[in-house]
């Protein structure tokens, strides 16, 4: 999958931007901007987008007899995002079984499970807002370039997020859901069905904030540090459970040789939902930079004096 020109947002180029910006400054009565060093013609969308690869693989087994049906499927998906370094993968398993024990009794179950590694997603917005007159990279300093004075307080070079902060979030999501049911026919016209369903999700993630330096001709030495200038690690863990039970009684009958049909259904449902989430973060200690190594991205490695934390939890039922 690739981003074609027709799919990109149409923006002005470097010379067109200068023309429009000059008009804005003149209308505001402001001094003209000094474009020295700002003569690039950067297409930021071309810089951040990539030709992406997608694969989906599935295999399944099915079986059936007059009294029994069975299904088992396993799948694997891998996707690269339109933005460089973004990638997503998922493994799934699905199973179902229905069995007719007697002419009046049927039981079955269904199960769906998944393990997902979400993408460390980045934004396109900065690439749409960043001025095209800014160069991407300064070869002399070996650093990405800060944006001009009129922009750098609001946004940074889009490549900072895409390249320097690539793969700084590691997350795992697990999901398991399913149901079991039993259905019985009795007294010729009645059917009673009971179903119990459960949905369980467990998500966890870690995010690393690196020290980011960019080339900025407006500062002494030409090197500027973005943000706090300290490394940081944050973590979260979230578990959610949903349980539901449904009970249905159905009456069906025909009258007048089938010219009139009657179906009546009554039932009730119970529902339970619980969630528990913990969040924590720590910055580096004095002179103790947290390594850019996922094996070290745990809050216990940071300075306890800088710790922040939070939590969310609830239980609900109907």
Q: What name fits each language-model region?
A:
Residues 4-42, 51, 81-88, 92, ...:
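Surface-exposed loop/interface segments of Gram-negative outer-membrane beta-barrel transport/assembly proteins
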Residues 53, 57-63, 315-318:
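Structured alpha-helical segments in the cores of large, soluble enzyme domains
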Residues 74-80:
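Transmembrane beta-strand segments that form the barrel wall of outer-membrane beta-barrel proteins
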Residues 64-67, 99-103, 184-190, 253-257:
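Outer-membrane beta-barrel strand-turn architecture
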Residues 71-73, 108-109:
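Periplasmic plug
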Residues 25, 47-52, 61-65:
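Outer-membrane beta-barrel initiation region
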């Amino acid at each position: 999958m690739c981003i074609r020109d027709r799919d990109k947002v149409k923006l002005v180029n470097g010379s067109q931007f200068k023309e429009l910006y000059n008009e804005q400054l003149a209308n505001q009565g402001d001094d003209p901007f000094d474009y020295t060093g700002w003569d690039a013609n950067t297409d930021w969308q071309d810089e951040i987008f990539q030709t992406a690869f997608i694969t989906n693989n599935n295999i399944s087994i099915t079986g059936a007899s007059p009294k029994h049906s069975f299904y088992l499927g396993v799948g694997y998906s891998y996707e690269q995002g339109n933005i460089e370094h973004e990638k997503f993968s998922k493994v799934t398993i699905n199973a179902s079984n229905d069995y007719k024990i007697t002419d009046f009794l049927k039981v079955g179950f269904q199960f769906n499970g998944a393990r997902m590694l979400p993408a460390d997603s980045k934004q396109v917005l900065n690439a749409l807002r960043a001025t095209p007159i800014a160069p991407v990279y300064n070869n002399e300093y070996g650093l990405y370039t800060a944006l001009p004075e009129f922009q750098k307080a609001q946004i940074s070079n889009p490549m900072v997020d895409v390249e320097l902060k690539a793969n700084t979030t590691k997350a795992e999501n697990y999901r398991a859901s399913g149901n079991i049911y039993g259905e019985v026919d009795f007294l010729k016209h009645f059917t009673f069905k009971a179903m119990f369903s459960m949905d369980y999700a467990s998500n966890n993630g870690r995010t690393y904030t690196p020290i980011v330096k960019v080339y900025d001709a407006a500062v002494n030495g030409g090197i500027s540090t973005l943000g706090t200038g300290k490394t940081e690690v944050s973590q979260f863990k979230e578990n959610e459970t949903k349980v539901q039970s449904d009970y249905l009684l159905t009456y069906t009958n025909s009258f007048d040789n089938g010219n009139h049909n009657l179906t009546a259904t009554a039932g009730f449902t119970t529902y339970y939902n619980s969630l528990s989430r913990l969040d924590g973060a720590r910055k580096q200690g004095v002179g103790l930079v947290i390594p850019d190594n996922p094996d070290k991205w745990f809050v216990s490695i940071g300075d306890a004096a800088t710790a922040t934390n939070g939590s969310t939890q609830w239980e609900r039922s109907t």
